[in-house]
Design a protein with these regions (language model features):
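Hydrophobic core of transmembrane alpha-helices in multi-pass small-molecule transporters
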Residues: 4-27, 233-255
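Glycine-rich segments within core transmembrane alpha-helices of 12-TM secondary carriers
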Residues: 48-72, 95, 280-292
């Protein structure tokens, strides 16, 4: 993009516009991807097969972290700030072409084709979703418990840990990036395991366990990170201790997001499944996950503490756990053709 010095106020306007376009593209695909994968996955291993979709976010963070680390090691600080930061965006053009080709080659799911042939498709799915009391209730459960809970945990585990270790604990940025890579690498198989486990014992117990553990352990984990970080020995034992806490937090996140893809589709009837899953999921990511950094930062500043803001996600996760325990239905044996 042109810089502010080159085109003035149009530089940030163009950046915001492209970010909005990116958000619309990603938001429009996530629900459809979840439905598409779940309807193709079969009935006995939906949680396991669809959990691979949840790896894309952590993988994106992992790849981008490695890209930045490599560029910063190859380039001077001036070169990186001048043009080096643009390289990952150039590389993403290759992914865009590949994704477009794959997208164009995909065929509709057998369930959707059967629905099309029977002429029972909903012509106004969004309106039908809000007219049906059971669908409305399940959209709220998806929004509040599953999607918002996952967004809150994702922020705490994948985003705020790095910020906290760099700014509050004052660890070297290179060490924090290294620790973040360890945690993300651990998150990948843990997410798949959580999806598999939800096939065996049910989606609800796995998700509720993750929400409860998140509500009870987020604050103690960050307090412990701060205490260990104050030793500042940077020994192998020090690194192992910090990495262990981060991997433990990753395991909690995995319990919520592992079954999430299957749940997005299983909660709703075939004829309105895509819109019913997509709307609450994206609203939760935007409203709850998107505003979380702002709220946590404000609370930290207001209470003059580095961890006070984490009471907000703690209370939110506890509330989500209670609502999910009382009202979230078990769906791992649901018939997706209905």
């Amino acid at each position: 993009l042109p810089t502010y010095a080159q085109i003035g106020i149009w530089a940030p306007i163009l950046l915001v516009f492209l970010r909005l376009l990116q958000g619309l593209s990603a938001g429009g695909e996530i629900g459809g991807s979840a439905v598409y994968l779940t309807e193709h996955a079969g009935s006995s291993s939906r949680g396991f097969k669809t959990s691979f979709l949840q790896l894309m976010g952590p993988l994106g963070i992992l790849v981008s972290t490695l890209q930045i680390a490599l560029l910063q090691s190859w380039l001077s600080p001036e070169e990186f700030l001048s043009w080096g930061w643009r390289v990952p965006f150039w590389i993403s053009l290759i992914l865009l072409i590949l994704a477009f080709k794959v997208r164009m080659a995909l065929e509709e799911t057998p369930i959707f084709l059967q629905l099309s042939q029977s002429d029972t498709q909903s012509k106004t799915p969004l309106r039908d979703n809000f007219r049906d009391p059971e669908t409305r209730k399940r959209m709220f459960l998806l929004f509040f418990c599953i999607s918002a809970g996952g967004a809150v945990l994702f922020f705490c585990v994948q985003v705020y840990t790095s910020i906290f270790l760099k700014t509050a604990v004052k660890l070297p940025p290179q060490l924090v990036d290294q620790l973040s890579v360890y945690a993300t690498l651990a998150l990948l198989p843990l997410t798949i395991f959580a999806g598999w486990l939800s096939d065996k014992i049910g989606r609800k117990p796995v998700v509720v366990t993750g929400l409860v553990l998140g509500a009870t352990l987020i604050l103690p984990a960050f307090h412990l990170l701060q205490e260990i970080g104050q030793t500042a020995t940077y020994s192998a034992g020090f690194t192992f201790a910090i990495a262990g806490i981060l991997i433990g937090l990753s395991a909690i996140l995995a319990l919520v997001v592992g079954p999430q893809t299957a749940l997005l589709a299983e909660l709703f009837p075939t004829k309105t499944r895509n819109s019913a899953a997509t709307l609450p999921h994206n609203l939760a990511a935007g409203w709850i996950g998107g505003l979380l950094p702002l709220i946590v930062t404000w609370l930290n500043q207001h209470w003059e503490s580095t961890v006070a803001g984490l009471w907000y996600p703690t209370i939110f996760l506890a509330s989500s756990a209670v609502v999910a325990l009382l009202y979230l239905p078990e769906t791992n044996q649901v018939n997706l053709t209905k």
